[in-house]
Amino acid sequence: RIHWDKRPNNTRRRGAYSKDGGQTWGDWHIIEALPDGHQQRSYGCMGGLTRLAVKGRDILVFSNLDTSNAKREKITVRASFDAGKTWPVKRLVFDGPSAYSSMTSGRPGTDTEGWVYLHFEGGPKGGSTVAKFNLAWLLEGTPTGDGAVPRL
């Protein structure tokens, strides 16, 4: 099953699912727990999405801004443990200016297994930054009130 995350013209992300490899999409919905960029604008900010390879689990990690200001700042990551239905935990990666982001997960059976790599515009030196973290670090974040973190 494929999850598609779309950047709409409002302050929340929209999602859809495909069961045929992306040929068709259904279950369009607004994801209330996922902000789409700074909340004082009618447009969003490109975010990242990756799946962690954890046997028996469907863990997604999403990156985007988490600010109510009209500024692009506070790049934050969130985790879902149920294929994107809920997003119960978030953690701030960088508190300053930040914007577009993309992510990838490490490959099973390599030294990168278990790591998430977040590339984002901004950071302590401006330009672009790559942050590396794992699920244990993200789980030390803030509960969002959207679902529960399962025992892992």
Residue spans for each PLM region:
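Asp-box/BNR beta-propeller blade signature and adjacent active/binding-site loops
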Residues: R1-L152
